Curated annotation (Swiss-Prot):
It comes from Serratia proteamaculans (strain 568). Catalyzes the hydrolytic deamination of adenosine and 2-deoxyadenosine. Its EC number is 3.5.4.4. GO terms for molecular function: 2'-deoxyadenosine deaminase activity; adenosine deaminase activity; zinc ion binding. This is Adenosine deaminase. It is an enzyme of class 3 (hydrolase). Substrate binds at H14, D16, G170, D279.
Amino acid sequence: MIDSRLPLTDIHRHLDGNIRAQTILDLGRQFNLALPADELEALRPHVQITHAEPDLVSFLQKLDWGVAVLGDLEACRRVAYENVEDAANAGLHYAELRFSPYYMAMKHQLPVTGVVEAVIDGIRSGSRDLGIDVRLIGIMSRTFGEAACLQELEGLLAHRDGITALDLAGDELGFPGGLFLNHFNRARDAGLRITVHAGEAAGPESIWQAIRELGAERIGHGVKAVEDPALMDFLAEHGIGIESCLTSNIQTSTVASLAQHPLAKFLRHGVMASINTDDPAVQGIEIEHEYLVAAPQAGLTPAEIRTAQENGLKMAFLSEQEKQTLRDKVRG
C-alpha cells in the first residue's frame, strides 16, 4: 500500500532508462535510424524486459535503443521533459532522476556538456509546468572507463547548479570503484552529494569501498550487504541508505525471486532502505507496482512498506527544511 498522507518518492530512477517506446519510434523516424521494428508493439520486446535477463550487463543492453535515437540535443531535452511527465503521472511528489551524459551523447557524438545542459533545461521546464520537485543525479558510466568518466564529471561540474549528486553505475565487476577515487574527490570538493551503485553485481567489499573510499552517503541496490553482518551493522549505525529496486533485481538475476530479496532484512535490521523503480520504461513497471505488488511479495508488512516510504524522503538529497515543506504540502 501507499500511504497518501506521506510524500511518495523515487530516488533511484534512471532518466536514460525511462525513454518511452513511442519516443524511441518517433525519434528513430525523425533521424532516419534503423530500428529493430517500425511499429510500437513490435518494437516493445526490443526495448522492454519481457523475462529475467541472465546478468546485469544483459539487462543494461535493453537500454541501448533508447539512447541510440538521441540524434541531437533537443531530443535529449524532450526525453528529460517526458521523464518529469512520467514521474508526475506516476503520482510522485519528489523524484531524483539520474543520467549518464556520456552514454546519452555517445551514439551521435553529441557534446557531453551540451547533453547535461539540455537535460537540466528539460527537467526545469517539466518541474515548472507540472509542479513536481525533481532533482538530477549525474552518473559516471564506469563501463566506458576512467577517461570517459572524467568527461562526464567535467560536463556535470560545468553545470553544477543543476546537479545535486554524483553516482557511479555500469559494469561493477569489470570497473571497481577504486579506479575513480580522484573523480569522487573532485565531486565532493565541488559540494556534490554521493550515491554509488554497489553490491549489485559485486559483493559486500564493493559497498565498503563505495563508503570508505568514494564517500557514498547512499548505496544503489546494495543487495549483497546481507552477506556481511558487520556491514549491516555499519549501515544501520551510520544511517547510510539503501536504494532498493525490487523488480529490477529480479530482472537482472541479482536476486532469484522477490521472496529472497533482502529489503525486509534491511528494514528489520534498522537499515534505512527505500522502494524505487530503477528503469521504469525498460522494466515495464511503475512505482505503484513496486509498492502494491513487489513489496508484499518480498515479504514486507504494511508497516514496513510505510517505513520504506518514509525512508524515501529521509534519504532524499534535500535539506531538512525542504523535506518538511514537502511533508506539509502532501498533508495539505
